[in-house]
Amino acid sequence: MKLTKLLTYLMAEPVQNDFHDPDITSIEMDSREVRKGSLFVCIKGYTVDGHDFAQKAAENGAAAIVAEKELDVDVPVIIVRRSQRALSVLSDAFYGQPTKQLQLIGITGTNGKTSTTHMVDEIFKKAGRQTGLIGTMYIKIGDETFPVKNTTPESVTLQKTFKKMNDEHVDTAIMEVSSHALSLGRVHGCDYDIAVFTNLTQDHLDYHKTMEDYRQAKSLLFSQLGGSFNHEKPKRAVLNADDKASAYFEKVTAAHILTYGIENDADVMAKQIEISAQGTSFELVTPKGTKQITVSLVGRFNVYNVLAAAATGIAAGLPFDTITSALEELQGVRGRFELVNHNQPFPVVVDYAHTPDSLENVLNTCKDMTEGKLFVVVGCGGDRDKTKRPKMAEIAVRIADEPIFTSDNPRSEDPLAILRDMERGVEGTYYHSIANREQAIFFAIANAKKGDVVLIAGKGHETYQQIGNETFDFDDAEVAGRAIVELNKK
C-alpha cells in the first residue's frame, strides 16, 4: 500500500523530510523488525520509548516513521497526537479492515473472560461457524494455536491475526478484551458486533489507579459499538444484571442490550441451581426457551460464565437447542478450576484466581466440597496492585483452614516483602508463609488427608514463574502432580 493512501486514514501528512510516496511493506513498532519499506511507529511504553529507536529503524530501511514529536532522522516523519492510536488505525487500514468481514465478539470484565470466551467459541462451533479465538492462553484459528504475550495483542498483531482469519475463512472471532488494551487504544478499528461484560471487581489498580478509571476503560468496549442501527450487521451488548457496573455501560452504548443474571431479573437467568463436585445443574431461562441443563463445571461463578455465553449465543441469533447442547458438552478450561488427579484421596484444584473477588468465589466453591480441611496456596504478583495483597490474605484466612502464602511471579520485587504486605492483613491469625512456591505446594499436598481439599490459586494455566529479570518454567498442575506422586509413595 502506498504511504499517501495509508495516511488518508490518519488525515495526516509528512511534516518532516521529503518523500516519493513509497510502498509500505509492513507496519512495525519494534525497530529490530524493521526492513526496507517498513513504516515504523514510535510507541512510548512503560520502560522503553520507541522514539529513542527511530534512528535504528531508519538505518534498517524504514520508509517512513510515525512519531509524537520531530526526530533527527533522514526519512519522512508523520507527527501525530497519539502514536498508539495511530498504530491501531494504520494497522486496520494496512490489513484491509479485516474485522468488517467477521462477526466480532469482545468479552471484557475482571474475572471470567477466558472461560466465557472458550464457552462462546464452543457454542458457535456447534452452530457450524468457523471460529477464531484471541485470549489469555493463546490465539486459535480453526484448530491451529499460536502463543500470545498479552491478553489482547498489540494492534498491529491483532489486525494481522484478523487478516489471517479472513484468509482461513473464519467467519466468527471471539476475543478477550483487556482494560489495558481499551485504554491504550489497541482495539481502535475493531468493528465489534457483540460486546460482553462479565463483572467488575478490584484488579489492575497499579495501572488504572481508581475503580472509576477502571470502569471507564471497560466501558470503551460498549461505546465502541457505535450509534448506528445496521440490520445487516446489528450491534448487541450483553450485560451482567447482577453487577452494578452494567448500569453505567448501558448508558454509554446505543446497541440493543441483553442481560443475564441469577439474583436480579434478567433476559437470561439460572434458577434452581444445584452444585456438586461433579458439576452444576440449573434451569436455563431465556427469551428463546427454558431448559434444565447440567454442565461439568463447578461453582456459582461458572454459572455466570455459562449465562454470559448463552446470552451471547442468543444475541447472535443462534438456535436455543444448539446453545444448550454445546453448554452440556463443555469441558473445563485449563487452569480454571482444573482438577489434578493422580489417585490421591482428596481433590486438588488449580485455578487462575488472582483477584480478591475471584479468590473468594473459588474458595467458597471449594469450601462446599470440603468435609475436612480446606488448604489454599496463594500469592500476589510483584510490580502489580499492592492494595489487594492484604485483602487476598484476609480472604484466604477467613475461608480456608490452612492458608499458605507464597510467591506468584514476584518480578522485580523481593518475594519476602510481598509476603509481608499480605501478612499485614491477617496479623494475629493462623497461616503459613513459604516463599518458595514449589515447596508451598508440596507442603499443602503432603499435609492433606481424605476429606480435605487443596486449592492452588493464582497462576492457573501459566507455565512460568517470573523472578527478577528471569523467567523459569513453572506449572502449578505439573508441580502438584509431582507432589501427589511423592505422597502416594508413602
UniProtKB/Swiss-Prot annotation:
The keyword ATP-binding applies. Its cofactor is Mg(2+). One of its GO terms (cellular component) is cytoplasm. InterPro entries: Mur-like_cat_sf (IPR036565), Mur_ligase_C (IPR004101), Mur_ligase_C_dom_sf (IPR036615), Mur_ligase_cen (IPR013221), Mur_ligase_N (IPR000713), MurE/MurF_N (IPR035911), UDP-N-AcMur-Glu-dNH2Pim_ligase (IPR005761). It comes from the Bacteria. It is found in: Cytoplasm. ATP binds at residues 109-115. Meso-2,6-diaminopimelate binds at residues 384, 408-411, 458, 462. This is UDP-N-acetylmuramoyl-L-alanyl-D-glutamate--2,6-diaminopimelate ligase. It comes from Bacillus velezensis (strain DSM 23117 / BGSC 10A6 / LMG 26770 / FZB42).
